[in-house]
């Protein structure tokens, strides 16, 4: 009988450190779904349970639950999903620019 205590991270403190170069490259290779793929790798990754700080009980519903300030909070789904998408799009763009600059400096 194993007991696992997982401390869920605050939505604003989501950990991206587990992502490897390969993870980012795979996201970018997914072309039309690159941001969605990144969100899945970060927030819906069973190997990184502490990042599972988003809960959508119904795809058709108007609300989403996020773990923030040590409690689950009900938020407007459209607004939160738009913010989540935008933030992860920026993360992916920043990683790509740094990656390309690193390649350029090697040439």
Predicted segments — roles?
Residues 1-107:
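Extended amphipathic coiled-coil helices
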């Amino acid at each position: 009988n194993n007991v696992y205590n997982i401390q869920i991270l605050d939505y604003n403190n989501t950990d991206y450190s587990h992502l490897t170069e390969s993870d980012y490259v795979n996201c970018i290779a997914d072309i039309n779904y690159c941001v969605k793929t990144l969100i899945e790798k970060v927030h819906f990754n069973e190997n990184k349970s502490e990042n599972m700080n988003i809960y959508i009980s119904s795809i058709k519903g108007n609300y989403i639950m996020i773990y923030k300030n040590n409690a689950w909070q009900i938020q407007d789904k459209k607004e939160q999903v738009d913010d989540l998408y935008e933030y992860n799009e920026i993360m992916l763009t920043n990683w790509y620019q740094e990656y390309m600059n690193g390649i350029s400096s090697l040439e």
